[in-house]
């Protein structure tokens, strides 16, 4: 009996240890993001915090308006990661600043978290935020003519699922979504029993009914999938599989590896404090230039 149980116990112990280490990494990132945001420059943009895009407490976004807008005033909507159970927009001021200084308006959104709210709640929240920004663009002096969705980790899954979803929420500016940029995103994996994110999904629902990989359709959106060279959280196959499926459907997709970074550090390396030492922001800018060129 013990011999039969031993492999299971070993797997369970490994899962617990993995979850503990990732939890530690999130806590370290919280401290790091606090420091990044304290050191983030306040020049070159204005910010309106806690804009209510819906009626619930987590229906909030921070809106960064550039002081030197590009042509057509493109809007980046950023969705944070955190295994669908952790994270807050306040930790990502450095994202707003990093791209507002490049001529983009940036909306950084909150969304409802697991385990209280499981898939597709966070996807519906993103769609609601997009519709709010579209309706109120004149009020906030922004434009939804050129929208770029960008997300990290779980947030990358969310932005991809906003388009590729079993029962998509109607997005009013759907035809104005020019590009999707996924940073270290999980797009094609089995979450059943996963030690990190099992509580974010209905365990009785097969992943084939959830993952955006299975709902890709042909469109004119440009897709940019960035993976971290040293990612030990999200498997490379997620981006490789999605890139292949997008191309099979005739879509535009680019798969790029960012060297010398891991899963958590990928997003921090975008900040003005660290972007000179890593190529993450450079590759995102390359994607933006490619997506928005005439």
Locations of the language-model features?
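N-terminal cap/lid segment of alpha/beta-hydrolase-fold proteins
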Residues: 23-70
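Short amphipathic alpha-helix adjacent to the substrate-entry channel of hydrolases
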Residues: 90-108
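Alpha/beta-hydrolase active-site loop
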Residues: 117-138
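Primarily recognizes the serine-hydrolase "nucleophile elbow" in alpha/beta-hydrolase
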Residues: 131-195
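Mobile cap/lid helix-loop segments that gate and shape the active-site cleft of serine hydrolases
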Residues: 185-215, 221
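Short beta-strand/loop motif that positions the catalytic acidic residue
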Residues: 219, 225-227, 231
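Conserved alpha/beta-hydrolase "acid-adjacent" motif
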Residues: 232-238
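C-terminal catalytic histidine-bearing segment of alpha/beta-hydrolase fold enzymes
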Residues: 240, 249-294
